[in-house]
């Protein structure tokens, strides 16, 4: 009987010991830091470069008659703004390639779609003219957003718009005043 108690005690101790050995395993990982210190009135929020505009699937017929289609509302988000440095911001947009038929549109730079392009409206709902500053946006201390609307449009009245995928890039520069 005494031997049974000793055997049980040894077995119990062994079981607890193996559990503590199992609990001693660790999980490892790492934290990576990145960013950029800038000498401007505001910094870009991490989700604002690049800003991804996904039009999804837009029927070719939606562009008929010069209609704007897609109309995706997006924001350029600014953070840590300091109004003692500047009180307004203007944005200048420049596509990597301007549509050769309609200079108000960004050209599709890859993909199989053709006959249309991408346009933007600024925070004041004005059509963006590439290379020219937009209407000024009033800044507040802290976080600010600069809204814009991206749209698709046929490149000329009655243009043959070919269905397919497309990509394009428009760069932007923010000037503070």
Regions found by a protein language model. Give the residues of each.
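Bacterial N-terminal signal peptides
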Residues: 9-17
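Mature extracellular/passenger domains of Gram-negative fimbrial/pilin and adhesin proteins
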Residues: 2-6, 21-177
């Amino acid at each position: 009987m005494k031997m049974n108690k000793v055997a049980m005690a040894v077995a119990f101790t062994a079981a607890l010991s193996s559990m503590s050995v199992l609990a001693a395993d660790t999980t490892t990982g790492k934290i990576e830091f990145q960013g950029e210190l800038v000498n401007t009135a505001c910094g870009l929020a991490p989700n604002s470069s690049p800003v991804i505009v996904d039009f999804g699937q837009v029927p070719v017929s939606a562009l008929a008659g010069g209609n704007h289609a897609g109309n995706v509302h997006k924001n350029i988000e600014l953070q840590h703004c300091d109004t003692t440095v500047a009180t307004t911001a203007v944005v200048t947009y420049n596509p990597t390639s301007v549509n050769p038929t309609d200079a108000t549109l960004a050209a599709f730079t890859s993909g199989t779609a053709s006959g249309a392009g991408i346009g933007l409206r600024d925070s004041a709902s004005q059509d963006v003219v590439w290379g020219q500053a937009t209407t000024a946006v009033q800044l507040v201390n802290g976080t600010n957003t600069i809204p814009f609307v991206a749209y698709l449009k046929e490149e000329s009245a009655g243009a043959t718009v070919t269905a397919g995928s497309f990509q394009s890039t428009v760069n932007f520069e923010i000037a503070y005043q």
